[in-house]
Amino acid sequence: MPTYTRLYSDKHGESHFEDVEIDLTLTEYAPPAPPLELSSTTLAKQFGFMQAPAGWSSDWHPSAARNTFFVLSGEWEVTASDGEIRSFPAGSVLRAQDTTGKGHSSRVISDSLAVMVQLED
């Protein structure tokens, strides 16, 4: 089953990573095309592209909004406030939901292009 990574804040303000399985259901999505597997949908507020060069890094910060990042090229490294570090190469999906608390830090390992989708509150 496919997964994505969720970054969230606990009740004490620490951020943590969680691997989330994506539930897919065989769906007649666009007949007469054959059925395909589809997940439930989430409302989105806006989306945009984000590009950063290798070596870019941030200080500790919470996510400005509930965002989902789809890494198209390059690689990001994100550190949760609990100390766990994860890499997000091209093809990765990160749902950043740590909008309160200590947040996380980020750095770009190799020149990166990502799509950022801001979710509805």
Predicted stretch roles:
Residues 1-3, 63:
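Short, small/polar residue-rich loop motifs at catalytic or cofactor-binding pockets
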Residues 3-9, 16, 103, 107-121:
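Double-stranded beta-helix
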Residues 10-11, 71:
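Short, acidic, Ser/Thr-enriched surface-loop or helix-capping motifs
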Residues 14-60, 112-121:
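A short glycine-rich, His/Asp/Glu-containing loop-to-beta-strand
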Residues 22-23, 51, 81-99:
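Short acidic-glycine-tyrosine-enriched beta hairpin
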Residues 28, 86, 102-108:
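Short, Lys/Arg- and Gly-enriched loop/turn segments at beta-strand edges
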Residues 55-58, 77, 93-95, 99-105:
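Histidine-centered metal-chelating micro-motifs
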Residues 57, 62, 68-89:
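A short beta-strand-loop-beta hairpin characteristic of the jelly-roll/cupin
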